[in-house]
């Protein structure tokens, strides 16, 4: 179980260089398109491999397209976002709660940019590292360990910045 977070209007910094693979990518479309699975199923195994490779590289080159975390990593990250954003209404309580449930919480472009700014500021100020130490001390005896790491915070900040808003699926 994980959280799939899709940019609603992502910044595209680089298109795939491989024309054939790019054609496959455009033909199949996005995971949330109604006919995605049908188009995916019709591909040959070779084309599925090409699609997967180009899709992965495209997402790495354009961090606002897609962010993923398993539930163990997502919960402390989303809780930290809430901690930084709850006081002045950047996020609503409903968005925060929906963000933990794969229920399609929608975060608009303005909110996404504010989240990115706050996360990057928290990294720069050393607050993320302080939070990590306190979080680990507070949860060291918990039966389940949910990791919290600065590199995950940074990856999410980069995603938010380039996402154009996002949907948590």
Annotate each language-model stretch with its function:
Residues 1-169:
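Acidic (Asp/Glu-rich) sequence patches and key acidic residues
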């Amino acid at each position: 179980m994980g959280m799939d977070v899709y940019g609603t209007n992502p910044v595209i910094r680089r298109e795939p260089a491989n024309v054939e693979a790019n054609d496959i990518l455009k033909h199949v479309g996005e995971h949330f398109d109604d006919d995605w699975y049908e188009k995916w199923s019709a591909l040959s195994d070779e084309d599925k491999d090409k699609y997967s490779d180009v899709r992965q590289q495209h997402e790495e080159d354009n961090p606002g397209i897609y962010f993923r975390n398993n539930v163990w990593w997502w919960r402390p990250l989303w809780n930290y976002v809430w901690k930084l954003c709850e006081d002045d209404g950047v996020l609503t309580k409903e968005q925060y709660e929906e963000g933990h449930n794969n229920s399609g919480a929608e975060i608009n472009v303005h909110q996404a940019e504010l989240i990115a700014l706050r996360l990057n500021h928290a990294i720069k100020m050393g607050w993320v590292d302080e939070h990590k130490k306190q979080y680990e001390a507070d949860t060291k005896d918990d039966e389940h360990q949910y990791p919290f790491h600065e590199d995950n915070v940074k990856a999410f900040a980069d995603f938010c910045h380039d996402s154009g808003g996002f949907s948590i699926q």
